[in-house]
Amino acid sequence: MTAVVEAFGKPHVNVGTIGHVDHGKTTLTAAITKHYGNFVAYDQIDKAPEERKRGITIATAHVEYQTEKRHYAHVDCPGHADYVKNMIVGAAQMDAAILVVSGVDGPMPQTREHILLAKQVGVGYIVVYINKADVADADMIDLVEMEVRELLSKYGFPGDEVPVVVGSALKALEDDSSEYGKKSIDKLMEKLDEYVAVPPRPVDLPFLLPIEDVFSISGRGTVVTGRIEKGEIKTGEEIEIIGLKATQKTICTGVEMFKKLLDKGSAGLNVGILLRGTKREEVERGQVLAKPGTITPHRKFKAEVYILKKEEGGRHTPFFANYQPQFYLRTTDVTGSIKLLDGKEMVMPGDNVSVEVELQVPIAMDKGLRFAIREGGRTVGSGVVSEILE
């Protein structure tokens, strides 16, 4: 979400490589950085630093590179399980994904799973790189392209218009000057620049602030504090208080930061917002302040979840239908029950599954909202809302 033009002098986009194991994701990442970034050798990418996000360890490699038009931050994961976790936990929110498919083997099970996950977690664009073209048969490459386009369409991406680049990441890494070598990387970068739109900066989106704390200031009224997630708020604007109970309308009568009054607050800032005529007991942590009509409270939704393994600090045993953990959404824990789908009877630690969740109280939410699943105060899983039900 950060189109930080200021820092790099050009728009910024987050991308990542996805695709089946051994189809060449890491080799491609190395080839791109060799020609467009500070070169990172293959074995350095694979020895990724372990990142801890919400207590879940994901091995990811972060590299960056730039074209004349843009700056890209790129994430590559060594193992399939890490991809699944990374996409669900959102340790690296991808604006676009480069789908790597071997021209020798064509789409494989993880190719499908990664495309489906990309759709569920809201990756906006996919660009395809058909790899190993130097050792694949030309007819086979045409067939692979057709299959990949069909697969993308099946999972809701515009399969007919997705750019497909054919090449060899290994040849590109060896500085080969043929069509399949460095030229294929140039073409891939060109397609990323052309096809992937720079995401709107959070500031341009409708105002939203998850409430962290509520204070009563004598003579001035009620102040709520939190970090503005997106948009801007100005004194005098009408806002809604959403979630946990009936939605209320109020007016922002002041925005303050570090005891200073501001004329407006914008995305990324931690602020206090003074609410007109709202009593201290009418607002609580876990609700959100938002621009009227932009977000609604819901109790039932479908989600894509990852359940931590025992070694990651998760449960030691499986759970069954109607399991009732806490769901930590934005700033608060809410109890809910999990319904298993597709005839599944239980979920093992380490599994990635689609589930239906029903919360005991409604929470302001949109598709794409990420949450942690907790039990007795510790995180046992992580998820992302894939569809609102009611």
From Swiss-Prot:
Enzymatic reactions: GTP + H2O = GDP + phosphate + H(+)
Region span, G5: 168-170
CDD domains per UniProt: EF_Tu, EFTU_II, EFTU_III
Location relative to the cell: Cytoplasm
Location, primary (coarse class): cytoplasm
Regions crossing the membrane: none
Binding site for GTP: 19-26, 76-80, 131-134
Region called G4, residue ranges: 131-134
Subunit structure comment from the entry: Monomer.
Name this polypeptide is given: Elongation factor Tu 1
Gene transcribed to yield this protein: tuf1
